[in-house]
Amino acid sequence: MDNAPKTFKVDRHKQLVPLNPGLETNFVCSFEIKSLDGKPFQTTIVEQGQIKPTQYREVDDGFISGQLEGDGTPRSYFLVLRAQEPCECTVKIVLSPKQQVQPHQQTHQQSQQTHNKTVANSGDPPPPPPSQPNKFLKPKWIVGMVIGVVVLYLLYRYRAQLMDKLNLGSKTPFSKN
């Protein structure tokens, strides 16, 4: 990438400066921003999908520098500049590829990352809860069995009352009349 400083006219409107053009994924980006006349300005870093920056950093002395590291996911990052009073800012961006880790360190780092993801899952939806083994006595089964027993009892009782009514009307040798 061209490391030559670029000058931007900054005012109340947001000025976007791409930090990783070409969707670099594993990179280290160092940047320096300096207003030519030392006027204060505001800056922040946003991702491509982020429309409105949430918080700007006030630069009162007219100079700021920083560093951004890509985490391996394809995202575009932008430097956002704005100022209450119009000024010119010089931006120097140095983009370099991130150094590869040795295999032993990489496996240790991956296990550490998976441990960190399980401890604090930032931004990702939470994993589904572990499935529980099927129990025979689930609450819905218990309620269903209780209802079934009650229905059988009521049918038995109704049948007994019906038989008593039918037996009263008929005369049998065992009845007393």
Swiss-Prot record:
GO CC entries: membrane
Start and end residues of each stretch annotated as Disordered: 100-135
Species in which this protein is naturally found: Invertebrate iridescent virus 3 (IIV-3)
Name this polypeptide is given: Uncharacterized protein 073R
Biased composition (Low complexity): 100-115
Localization (cell): Membrane
TM annotation in the entry: 141-158
Keywords assigned by UniProt, alphabetized: Membrane, Transmembrane, Transmembrane helix
Membrane topology, as annotated: Single-pass membrane protein
